[in-house]
């Protein structure tokens, strides 16, 4: 596919003091901690608005993975977040469980829209080309949600997390998977110093 983009911009001699600047933060837990929410963003101090999330999920356990709530802790929230979702699949637009039926079986269906989607699913690592083994890998998924129409505003601080909860034939259960994410937001400067990216070996897919 080929996509053409054009960008318009304005040149100014100076910017107002209240100008918000774009920020992004990458994180990964190669094995999430059982019973502990995965942190998408933390340590955001100041005033601004949250505009998007990308999550890459390699599932390491069987059964459905998307029951964990996405939570936004805003301006001093501690035990309870201001915004608490109903499941990761709902946050990324999959209240229908991304379900598609083929040959009498239910499979996950990818999809894309301007503001949220599930564009990537694979059980094969196409980057692998080795004569001694195949390219099988744990199921890999990619999701995005852009808060263009529904930005999450904060005046003092922001933390974003997601529970690791799935469901199987015995009901809900805590999961441990390989999760990485990018959080996107605008905020007024100054901002907190964030950790540097880890070595490339620690960022490779499983």
Describe each model-derived feature in a short phrase.
Residues 1-3:
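Positively charged, low-complexity/disordered segments
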Residues 5-206:
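Beta-strand-centric surfaces of beta-sandwich/beta-rich domains
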């Amino acid at each position: 596919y080929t996509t053409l983009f054009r960008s318009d911009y304005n040149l100014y001699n100076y910017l107002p003091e209240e100008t918000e600047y774009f920020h992004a933060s990458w994180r990964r837990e190669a094995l999430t901690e059982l019973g502990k929410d995965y942190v998408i963003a933390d340590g955001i101090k100041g005033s601004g608005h949250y505009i998007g999330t990308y999550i890459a999920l390699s599932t390491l356990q069987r059964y459905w993975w998307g029951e964990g709530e996405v939570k936004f802790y805003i301006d001093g929230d501690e035990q309870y977040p201001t915004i608490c979702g109903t499941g990761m699949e709902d946050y990324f637009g999959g209240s229908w469980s991304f379900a598609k039926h083929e040959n009498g079986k239910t499979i996950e269906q990818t999809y894309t829209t301007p503001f949220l989607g599930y564009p990537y699913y694979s059980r094969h690592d196409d980057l692998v080309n080795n004569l001694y083994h195949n390219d099988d890998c744990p199921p890999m998924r990619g999701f995005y949600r852009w808060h263009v129409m529904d930005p999450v505003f904060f005046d003092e601080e922001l933390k974003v997390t997601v529970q690791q909860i799935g469901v199987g034939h015995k009901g809900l259960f805590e999961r441990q998977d390989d999760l990485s994410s990018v959080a996107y937001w605008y905020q007024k400067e100054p901002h907190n110093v964030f950790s540097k990216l880890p070595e490339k070996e620690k960022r490779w897919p499983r």
